[in-house]
Amino acid sequence: MDAEFLKEPSNAGHLYQQVGLIFQNSDIQLFNTTVAEELAFGPRQLGLTEEEINQRVNDTLALLEIEHLKERIPYHLSGGEKKLVAIASVLTMNPSVLLFDEPFNGLSPKYQRIIVELLEELKTAGKTIIISSHHFDQIASIVERVLLFSEEHTITTSYSKMDWENHPEQRKAFTTC
């Protein structure tokens, strides 16, 4: 995908199917009456059959080990449970690129570990993962490249994972911001 591809309005549908965004605040992403309906919403918009939708919902619930939440109201869940449901709602769409905005904010250590393990699984499965985070230590095992941005939102420095690991002064400055 490049700028020319994105300029063509007919390509918008393709982009929506290929890229999934998980918001920092899960409350703004969740709006259905049950977790099952939340997970079914995206695939339903793609025009999939109910059989395929149910299969995706059940597979994703199992992948994230949240089958017990299936009939719960999303707004009544804990912060960590909401984050998993928000991620699951995107995974049911099976995008090739996943954008995570501050995936660890406000989560207990238990849910932070669960999210890290999930990100590692998704990476192993071949998904492209882009993470905006101030918690580098938690994502160090996942990332292949680190981009540092200025206050003007421009890239100031780009490191490969190996370069990043060889610059402890930059890591220290970044992880103490």
Please give the residue ranges for each predicted region:
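Conserved ABC ATPase signature
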Residues: 73-77, 81
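ABC ATPase NBD Q-loop/coupling interface
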Residues: 1-14
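Catalytic Walker B motif of ABC-type/P-loop ATPase nucleotide-binding domains
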Residues: 98-101
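Conserved beta-strand-loop-alpha-helix hinge in the C-terminal portion
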Residues: 153-175
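Hydrophobic anchor residue at the start of the ABC signature
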Residues: 87
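H-loop/switch region of ABC-family ATPase nucleotide-binding domains
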Residues: 133-134
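Conserved ABC ATPase "signature" region
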Residues: 51-69
